[in-house]
A protein has these predicted regions:
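Active-site beta->alpha loop and helix N-cap motifs at the rims of alpha/beta catalytic domains
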Residues: 2-117
Length: 117
C-alpha cells in the first residue's frame, strides 16, 4: 500500500500511444504497444516519479474496453513497479467504471483515478 510519502516529485500524465490508424472509426486495437513501452521507459528515464494514464487526454470516451485493458496492463508490465502507477477509470456511467476496475485485476497498478466527465 502506498503512503503519502510515496507520492512526490513529477507525475507524468501519459497519453494513449496510438497506432497510425487510430483516427479511423473502423479501427480496432489502436494502442501502439511499442510506442507505449518506449514512452514509459523514457518518462521514467527522464525523471518521472509517478505515472498516470487514461485520465487526462479523453481516453474515457475514445478507447474501446479491450484497448483500455491493453493500455493499462502494458503500462504496468513495462513499468515493472519502478514508479507508482495510477490508471483512470472515468466513464459516463457507474457500471462502466466498475467494469474498468475489473479489467485492472492482475495488473500491477497502485491506484485508480475517477473523474466526472
Amino acid at each position: 500500500m502506498l503512503s503519502a510519502q510515496d507520492i512526490s516529485g513529477l507525475m507524468a500524465m501519459m497519453p494513449a500511444f496510438a497506432t497510425d490508424n487510430a483516427g479511423d472509426y473502423r479501427a480496432r486495437s489502436t494502442v501502439d504497444v511499442g510506442r507505449l513501452h518506449a514512452g514509459v521507459d523514457r518518462m521514467i528515464g527522464d525523471g518521472a516519479n509517478v505515472i498516470s494514464t487514461t485520465g487526462s487526454f479523453g481516453e474515457c470516451h475514445t478507447l474501446l474496453m479491450d484497448e483500455f485493458r491493453t493500455l493499462a496492463h502494458e503500462t504496468a508490465a513495462v513499468n515493472k513497479q519502478r514508479v507508482p502507477l495510477f490508471v483512470g477509470v472515468t466513464s459516463t456511467h457507474t457500471r462502466e467504471v466498475f467494469e474498468k476496475c475489473k479489467l485492472l485485476e492482475g495488473a500491477k497498478v497502485d491506484g485508480i483515478l475517477v473523474g466526472v466527465p
